[in-house]
A protein has these predicted regions:
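N-terminal glycine/serine-rich phosphate-binding loop of ATP-dependent small-molecule kinases
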Residues: 1-78
Length: 78
């Protein structure tokens, strides 16, 4: 039976993050968001992900892609 749903895939990289919505039927891209990976720099110069900012960006991208998808989103993959 054909799978007429969509999946959202989250790719968190050290430079950029991509959140993409694909058709599960034929892997067609239904939408995508790309943004710079948020980072924090400590006074000592250590660099780490800014988890709160990153989470807000990912949540916003998921919400926008879900709302715009012509297919119901039933899966999220990281």
């Amino acid at each position: 039976m054909p799978d007429n749903s969509a999946a959202i895939v989250i790719d968190i990289g050290t430079t950029n993050c991509k959140v993409t919505c694909f058709s599960c039927l034929d892997a067609t891209t239904l939408g995508a968001h790309k943004f710079v990976t948020a980072k924090q720099i400590s006074p000592q110069g250590d660099v780490d992900f800014d988890i709160d900012a990153l989470w807000q960006e990912v949540r916003q991208a998921i919400a926008q892609l879900n709302a715009a998808s012509p297919l119901p989103v039933r899966r999220i993959s990281i």
